[in-house]
Amino acid sequence: DKDMRHEAEIAVRLGRPIQIYPIMETALRHASGLSVDAHMEHISKLWAGFSDVAASNPNAWIREAKSAEEIRTISDSKRPVSFPYPKLMNSNNNVDQAAALILVSEEKAKALGIAKDKWIYPWAGTDAQDHYYFSNRDNFHSSPAIRLAGGKCLELTGSTPDNIDMIDVYSCFPVAVQIACRELG
C-alpha cells in the first residue's frame, strides 16, 4: 500500500478530505472569478438540489430538504467546519457510498427471469486518475483525469453530452461535483 500523500504533505499534515476539498473549492472559486458570497450562493443552491433528492430517500442520512439559505447559513447547529464549507456542505462520517454493477450474459438474465425490457448493455468503460500527490497537481480547480476518461468514453460510444439523457454526478463535497460537470461538458 502506497501512501497517497507526498512527504511534504505528510510533514504539514495535509491529506484529509476536509483539508483538500476546501482548498480545491477556493481554487475553483478564484478560477471562476466569483466573489466569496456569489460562490457560496452557487454551491448552496447546488447542495439544496441534492438535499431535495435525499429527502425522498429512506436511506439518506438527512431526510429533511434544506434550502440553499439553510445550507449556507452559519448557526449554533450549523457551525463552520473548513472554509468555505459550513456543516451541511460536509460529508457525514458514516456514509456508505458503495455501489455495485453486476453484469451477466443474456442467457443468465433469461435464467434469472429478468424481463428483456430491463436489460442494459454497457457500451464502454474508461478509467483515469489525477496525480497521486495533491500538491503535485497542475492546479486544484480541474481534473484532467475526468476530462480524459469522460472524453474517451464519449468517443468510444460516439456520444456527446447533448445526447445523453442523464448523468449522475455526486460527491461528498460540492467542488468535486462542479469539477466533474465542467470536465464532462
Positions of PLM-derived features:
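Conserved "HGTGT" condensation-loop signature of ketosynthase/thiolase-family condensing enzymes
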Residues: 1-95, 99-101, 107-108, 115-185
